[in-house]
Amino acid sequence: VRDGYIAKPENCAHHCFPGSSGCDTLCKENGGTGGHCGFKVGHGTACWCNALPDKVGIIVDGVKCH
């Protein structure tokens, strides 16, 4: 279990709108305890999740979205 920016395939961010409930819902649907919209350098707005299961991908620093 770990916290991080949940990733789409190919290390891409789930973009979001600050203040919306979309990230919290996405994180919970993927087994996390909740989340919010944050900002990830190089990706822009992105969903940050708390306590995601290890099987759920998170953004890896230094790897470009492709």
Curated annotation (Swiss-Prot):
One GO cellular component, as annotated: extracellular region
Cited InterPro entries: LCN-type_CS_alpha_beta_dom, Scorpion_toxin-like, Scorpion_toxin-like_sf, Scorpion_toxinL, Scorpion_toxinL/defensin
Expression sites (tissue/organ): Expressed by the venom gland.
PROSITE patterns: LCN_CSAB (PS51863)
Protein family (similarity comment): Belongs to the long (4 C-C) scorpion toxin superfamily. Sodium channel inhibitor family. Alpha subfamily.
GO biological process, one term: defense response
Intracellular or extracellular location(s): Secreted
Domain called LCN-type CS-alpha/beta: residue spans: 2-66
Protein task: Alpha toxins bind voltage-independently at site-3 of sodium channels (Nav) and inhibit the inactivation of the activated channels, thereby blocking neuronal transmission. This toxin is highly toxic to insects and mice, and inhibits the binding of alpha-toxin to cockroach neuronal membranes.
Species: Leiurus hebraeus
Domain commentary: Has the structural arrangement of an alpha-helix connected to antiparallel beta-sheets by disulfide bonds (CS-alpha/beta).
Keywords: Disulfide bond, Ion channel impairing toxin, Neurotoxin, Secreted, Toxin, Voltage-gated sodium channel impairing toxin
Major location category of this protein: secreted
Molecular function terms, GO-annotated: sodium channel inhibitor activity; toxin activity
Cystine pairings recorded for this chain: 12-65, 16-37, 23-47, 27-49
Name under which the protein is recorded: Alpha-like toxin Lqh7
SUPFAM superfamilies membership: Scorpion toxin-like
